[in-house]
């Protein structure tokens, strides 16, 4: 369906959709800290940045209202923004307004990394390369795709237990992705 519409179904596109649902369930991760007014700002919208590797360095285009878009729409927009970033055609307003970001190094490789939270955001998720690993299930080894995820977050707002629940929710949604995405 996605490919017929001109998009490409990627892990990042799936994570955008699933993470938007997680941000609705865990609103602290979709907030920011306003140091001037000394308050927490809970966003009523979900705008997500996606790190794109370019020859000029990392750029983070923002997809607006992720929670209101289909997986097909997200796949197409992600591809268009990434291409604009790589071809130096991205506009400044397309790099602003994100509340949460995803950085996917899977195409480069590696097993884990720690992304840095971009202020005023309070969290960012890192995605490493997926692998197929043997997992012991019901008395036998079965092949399972493993996707290493990492989460960096601001402890002034989010504690470790909340972060673990947030990331666990995303993992469970990925395991049941056909139910949550379409």
Label each residue range with its predicted role.
Residues 1-182:
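C-terminal catalytic/motor cores of large multi-domain enzyme assemblies
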